[in-house]
């Protein structure tokens, strides 16, 4: 049986944590930041976890990460 291809777009956007859950970056951080509050921008730093509903689908896209 052939190897499963990794979806390259997903590989750049998601990482797996040590426990196997999928981490993601936050949206709304690349441009048009002047009208966003300091608090809002601060809370968008770092990573978040992908919702439980989407975990299975994204894990299939990045099988070897």
Curated annotation (Swiss-Prot):
Gene name, Swiss-Prot/TrEMBL: rpmI
Keyword Ubl conjugation: no
Family: Belongs to the bacterial ribosomal protein bL35 family.
Assigned keywords, A-Z: Ribonucleoprotein, Ribosomal protein
GO molecular function: structural constituent of ribosome
Gene Ontology biological process terms from the UniProt entry: translation
Disulfide topology: none
Protein name, per record: Large ribosomal subunit protein bL35
Domain of life according to the entry: Bacteria
Compositionally biased intervals (Basic residues): 10-24, 33-44
Ranges where the record places region Disordered: 1-51
Cellular component, GO annotation: cytosolic large ribosomal subunit
InterPro entries: Ribosomal_bL35 (IPR001706), Ribosomal_bL35-like (IPR021137), Ribosomal_bL35_CS (IPR018265), Ribosomal_bL35_sf (IPR037229)
